[in-house]
Amino acid sequence: MYAVVDVKDKQFKVQEGDTLYVPYHSDATAGQELTLDRVLLVSDGDGDVTLGTPTVEDATATARVLEHVKGDKVIVFKKKRRKRYRVKRGHRQQYTQIEIESLNANGPASSDDEEAAETSDAEPDEDPEAEPAEA
């Protein structure tokens, strides 16, 4: 099973257990669990693909923050010839490393849904073969 998720306007193809670098989340700390609810596409691996418009309803991905890291240095060099103008600057972009723990095509399971399923599976009090009472 794989999914395409949108994290801060960047799209990533993810599977359970994947580790990836996403744009920096300033409010997330190492070890914190994130719920990625902007799932654009879900595939179960058997060729069955669900495409969202723009997102797939009730589909989520759960991820754990591993650490905050900086990317490779990008050198910005400006120069104007014959004018003795040269500026050299460097920049390191910040990223958040996350690990995908689970993909849920039907959204997160809640206790209310489980209770409703248990109630619907319970046998009815009345005998279905009994004849209805006449009024």
Swiss-Prot record:
Region ranges (Disordered): 85-135
Protein's UniProt keywords contain Transferase: no
PROSITE patterns tied to this protein: RIBOSOMAL_L21 (PS01169)
Pfam family, one: Ribosomal_L21p
Bias kind Acidic residues: ranges: 111-135
Keyword terms, alphabetized: Ribonucleoprotein, Ribosomal protein, RNA-binding, rRNA-binding
GO biological process assignments: translation
Polar residues composition-biased segments: 93-107
An annotated GO cellular component: cytoplasm
Top-rank taxon, per record: Bacteria
Molecular function per GO: rRNA binding; structural constituent of ribosome
Role of this protein: This protein binds to 23S rRNA in the presence of protein L20.
Assembly notes: Part of the 50S ribosomal subunit. Contacts protein L20.
Family: Belongs to the bacterial ribosomal protein bL21 family.
Protein name: Large ribosomal subunit protein bL21
Organism listed in the record: Salinibacter ruber (strain DSM 13855 / M31)
The gene coding this protein: rplU
